[in-house]
Amino acid sequence: MALPDIAETRKLSDTEINEQISGTRRELFDLRFQQATSRLENPHRFRHARVKLAQLLTVQQERERSAAPAN
């Protein structure tokens, strides 16, 4: 499974980005819980979820900065 592509993330609407952020945070929480209880089958999913979350937050931040008036 390849890492997520930021170009796909940039195509999402603001609402979809917010939904994906909360979903990815929940996924990371679940992965940590599985790791703590020794039920984690795919440890590489940590990296994918972290990269996806970073990309989502980056795009969200870019949009907030472009919408804010420049001083």
From Swiss-Prot:
Belongs to the universal ribosomal protein uL29 family. SUPFAM superfamilies: Ribosomal protein L29 (L29p). One of its GO terms (molecular function) is structural constituent of ribosome. This is Large ribosomal subunit protein uL29. The keyword Ribonucleoprotein applies. The gene is rpmC. GO terms for cellular component: cytosolic large ribosomal subunit. InterPro entries: Ribosomal_protein_uL29, Ribosomal_uL29, Ribosomal_uL29_sf. Coiled coil: none annotated. One of its GO terms (biological process) is translation. It comes from the Bacteria. Keywords: Ribonucleoprotein, Ribosomal protein. It holds the Pfam family Ribosomal_L29.
